[in-house]
């Protein structure tokens, strides 16, 4: 897939990936994947997922969205339907009749729809991994650390060999 690398692992693997991946921007958990061409299908299939395994009762879970070449192209409506489905699921599982407080930790979610295929993910990273930088002061347009690491890997550079950067300024 363009822009993604998938792997299977456990919680330890997620922590290790966030700590040591040099070229990644984010590490996300795939919560669910399915096809949906209408809002009812999106709602029901989202609600059927085991959200209680990932989100505590007080979780704040903002839902970001994107849609490409799909019948469900109104992103704000898609985000609202996904949010409502998760709230319904958690309210049922946690036996809540009142509104969920969402005062706890934040669990950023994303709904991405491409050609009617829905991918629901939970972001485990927080700020982008390129922001973990080692530099205290940065110039006007620094190269992101993950991009620099990718370029070094693509160049087949070995320690001890000189590095020439013709665009260093």
PLM segments and residue spans:
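Non-catalytic nucleic-acid substrate-recognition regions in nucleic-acid-modifying enzymes
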Residues: 1-107
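Conserved class I S-adenosyl-L-methionine
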Residues: 159-169
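Short, glycine/acidic-rich beta->alpha junctions
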Residues: 103, 143, 169
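S-adenosyl-L-methionine
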Residues: 1-26, 65-80, 112-160
